[in-house]
Amino acid sequence: IRDSTIICNITSNYGESLGNASSVQKVFKNGKIYATRSRESMKNAIMTQSGMYDDLKVVVDKKVTQKEVTEKLNASNCKALEGGYMNTNNLTVIRKSSFYLTDAVACDEFVNETRFHNNLCLASTYARDNGINLQEKAGESGLMPYQYEFDKSLKKYSITFDLDKVGVDENFNAEAEVSEKIERVNLILETIENLSLVVKGNLDNAEPLMIFGGIGNCKTHYFDNVVNVTKSTLKITDELIERLNKEDYKIAFIEGGN
């Protein structure tokens, strides 16, 4: 098992919007509200930036859009299927992902920062080109205000690989070469090292500021429950030290004043 728990400084993504107001995704724990970036968003960014989705094939069957999977195109020879699939074209076949992510949850309690914007430049251009008085006929020119919550903060997420499952597709008794398995894992790890995320025009340097992990035998997010950062300070506990001293686990961090 290859396991990592990561601290990074990233923007939250957004849930449902109400009119022109957008809210960041949040979770409720320990009696408090924390902003998040969903594991689906994290996984999609990693798969896309790593090139793992470069060979993705998609089919639409009875208005259902899904990854294409056949006996000739499966997880052993298609990188895009490494993250798991369910295909219902003929018989339903399901393959679980060989790696799992958690949501990236803020280390500190959510503080609402609302940003207000409008499309004044576009509306002014339309009004000028069509002889409209913007002040008198703002609606006709398409002038529209909008607002959204904003959160960029330290967040924690974990990623765990089941190395025995990488490149293996039991639905078709197929398995990738060892070199292909190594390449897939390295592509994902290298992408996490240099990850960038975009939401509402914000480009985040989502590289790990601090990372705990290594290779061990525990098939779970091994450090997820013992890595606790509050107000940019890591809580060093006996349990954290004990786990770092087991097997081939290490800690690394960037001295960047974050």
State each model region's role.
Residues 1-258:
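RNA-binding basic/glycine-rich loop and surface signature characteristic of RAMP-family CRISPR effectors
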